[in-house]
């Protein structure tokens, strides 16, 4: 059953109040990318069994942190922040932040290389998949079909590690969307946007 708006709002409130010192630290950062990736210090995605709920709660938490950080918007109450309807842009940002948070932990060596901080031989994953940053600094694969007319999300899927909760939620969501079709169909749909390493044991 899909989570209700009140359930999502309550979850967002709980995530915010459980780590007030971390919220304060993120609020005072000047780097928006630090604010976004730092969301992992405020939230634990293992609390969520539903991908949509994870993205919505993350969107509300990001909105709340931004409003705290922006001195001119501090007059807006926390209730207004959590009850105002989320936009497509909010959810797109939430999706990207969740993905980049997982990538930052799983692919630290690859990120260091892509940032130009390492001049040695590229890590195996960089060489194997032709990894690069997109405009949101999300890691994508160049793939073998990069010259086709397919959408970028299919030509250059986002790289995710196996055995991570976010990866599991993504596969589960695709499986449900495919009306519980077999593994092959589920993975085919997942790979329209994501490439999950060793997604079949």
Describe the role of every protein-language-model region.
Residues 1-201:
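RNase H-like DDE catalytic core and adjacent DNA/metal-binding regions
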């Amino acid at each position: 059953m899909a989570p209700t708006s009140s359930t999502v709002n309550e979850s967002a409130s709980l995530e915010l109040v459980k780590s007030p010192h971390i919220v304060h630290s993120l609020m005072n950062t000047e780097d928006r990318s630090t604010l976004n990736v730092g969301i992992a210090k405020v939230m634990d995605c293992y609390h969520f069994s539903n991908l949509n709920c994870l993205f919505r709660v993350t969107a509300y938490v990001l909105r709340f942190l931004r409003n705290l950080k922006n001195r001119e918007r501090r007059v807006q109450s926390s209730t207004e922040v959590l009850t105002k309807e989320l936009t497509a842009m909010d959810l797109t940002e939430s999706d990207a932040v969740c993905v980049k948070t997982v990538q930052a932990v799983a692919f630290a060596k690859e990120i260091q290389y892509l940032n130009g901080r390492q001049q040695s031989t590229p890590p195996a994953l960089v060489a194997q998949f032709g990894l690069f940053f997109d405009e949101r600094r999300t890691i994508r694969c160049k793939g073998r079909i990069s010259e086709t007319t397919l959408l970028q999300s299919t030509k250059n899927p986002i790289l995710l590690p196996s055995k991570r909760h976010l990866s599991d939620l993504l596969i589960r969501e695709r499986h449900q969307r495919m009306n519980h079709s077999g593994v092959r169909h589920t993975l085919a749909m997942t790979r329209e946007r994501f490439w999950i390493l060793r997604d079949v044991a």
